[in-house]
Structure formats: structure tokens, C-alpha cells
Amino acid sequence: MENKKINLDKGYVLVYDFGDVKVHNYNTADYIDDQVILLEKNGKIAVIESPAFYDNNKELEKYIESLGVKLDGVLLSYHMGGGTFLKDSKKYATKKADEYGHIGGGKVLVDNFTKAFGESFDNNIHHVTDYINGGTITLADIKMNIIPTGDAFDIEIPEINFIYTHMLGSDCHSIIAGVDYANAMIDILKGYIEKNYNLILTSHYIPEDIKAVDTKIAYIETLLNIASTCNSKDEMIEKVKEEYPNYSGVNYLEMTAGFFFGE
């Protein structure tokens, strides 16, 4: 569906041109499959999420500069790490997302990634300059609906009928934080189907169409069934890997199993 692919030194950008609005999806090609979304309209740009590695920060800043557009700000939801990226620009987040990134689960992940990846990982936490609430915000002349979630927020972009959420991935494991989380996620994904979004943007996978939502619902339901037959984290991991041998993101599966079995 993308109109153009632009290869950079490390990552690449998929550009989707909808006339008035362009979506630039930056695939960092980093160790954790980070994606960063740029929304462009009327010579302005808004950024959704941040890269997490120093080399990606520089690469994406250079790409944004090459577009010759005015930066309206950065929306930070699930990814508060990478704090040196666009350091002097406006940073928008809900208070819940800010807490998630500074003292909650997001900070735990940053600490873990720092241990795993060392000095290449930018473990600085972004400073939020402007707090937002659920409702609407307009950046780069694009109206966006802010949808609060358990940890942070999703972003609906009605003008192009897109939604941004943390994770999807039709052939990738997801972080599912227990039974209640799984059931809530199924309800959210069914809502996506009802709204029939053109594309689902995420911070860990290239943009996908609505068919990927059906696939993910089936995955979560299977995950719940498998978990109900297991007695340990390791048993769950092995059974899910047997069911989905070609799925990437085994580290996410390991985290999921840890949530299900309290490890």
C-alpha cells in the first residue's frame, strides 16, 4: 500500500501519500523493531513516538530536516526513552503516559534495555513540555483524537481513518499482560474492526490493514487457551512457540508468559 520506500543508512521510511496528508513511517531497524510515525500536512510535521538508539535519533532528525517542514511537536505515548531526540522541540503526553515512562513499566523497559544494549541505547527520558487529556489535539493542521489506555494513550487520525496503537503485528508476538489485559485487548481490537480503519500504525511493526486485527484477535484467543492448560511460564512459552513457529518477537512472548505466571 505504501507509495514509496526510502532507504537510509540504517533504517528506512515508508511514505504513504493521501494528497493533503503524508504519513512517513520510519523503521529504525534497531534491536527492538521500533517504528516512528511522521504526519505531514501544509508544510508542517508532527511526530508520534521517539527512536531509542542514538544513531537512529540522528538519522531521523536528518531525514526530518531534509523534508524542509516546520516541526509542530512530538507526541509521546509508550516510548519515553530516547530523550535526546529532537531535544528542544515541544513534547506532548498525558500525565499517565508521562508516569508510565518515568516511573512505571516504560521506565522498567528502559532500564532493562540499557543493561542489554549499553551505550548505543539512549536511556534519557523525554521531558514532557505540554500535558494533554483525552479528547482532541491538532498538530501539523491534523486533528487527532487522544484515546487513553491502561498505560498511556492511542491516537486516532480521522482525516485518513488511521489509528496508532502500541503493538499489533500479524506475525509477531505481543506483550499481553495477563488474562484481564488480553480480554480488554480483544474488545479494543473488535472496535477497530467496527470502525474499519484504513491502516493501523504501531511502534513495533510496519503499518498494517484491518486484516491484521482479525489475525491478532485469533492469536490472543489462542494464547488464552494455551495459558489455561499450562502450569508454568516455560511450558506456556514452549506451547505458544509450537503453535506459532515462525513468529518473531520471542522476547515479547517471554514477557507475556511472565505476566501470566507471576514471574
List PLM regions with ranges.
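Metallo-beta-lactamase
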Residues: 6-10, 97-152
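Conserved beta-strand hairpin/beta-sheet module of binuclear metal-dependent hydrolase folds
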Residues: 7-63, 153-167
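Short loop/helix-cap segments at secondary-structure boundaries that form the rim of catalytic
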Residues: 15-17, 82-89, 102-103, 137-138
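Active-site environment of divalent metal-dependent phosphoester hydrolases
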Residues: 33, 54-56, 76-84, 98-101, ...
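Active-site metal-binding motif and surrounding structural segment of the metallo-beta-lactamase
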Residues: 43-44, 53-97, 196
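Active-site-proximal loop/helix segments of hydrolase catalytic cores
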Residues: 142-196
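Divalent-metal (often Zn2+) His-rich catalytic cores of metallo-beta-lactamase-fold enzymes
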Residues: 182-239, 245-246
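Short, amphipathic C-terminal "tail helix"
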Residues: 249-263
